[in-house]
Amino acid sequence: MRAVIDVGGGTRDIFGAGVFDYFLEHGVTFDRCYGVSAGCANIASFLAGQQHRNYEFYTEYAMRKEYMSLDNFIKTGSYVDLDYVYGTLSNSYGEYPLNFEVLKSNPSEFIIIAAEANTG
């Protein structure tokens, strides 16, 4: 069995995005993929076969004030507007949608690691 874990780390996980692009370029596959936070986004794009998708999110879209800004922080308490990232940009009709059909048909097991916010 081959497995991979991407522990995320917000925008620091651009490194992970590059690693998954390398895996796609070289046909590397895994039986299980574990993702935490931003690592889930990297793995979703990897399993959907969308090379360079997350790199563009980190380098192109992140420059938009809707994506990441002090205004977001003042309005919502979060520097990054995750509704914009995972809704507006990534949904089926978004600017750069995740290929859900390919993701769902990928035989790899995708395990998302999360904790309940109030109890841990």
How would you name each of these model-derived features?
Residues 1, 29, 106-109:
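Short coil/turn connectors at secondary-structure junctions
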Residues 75-120:
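Active-site-adjacent alpha/beta core region of enzyme catalytic domains
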Residues 3-93:
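Patatin-like phospholipase
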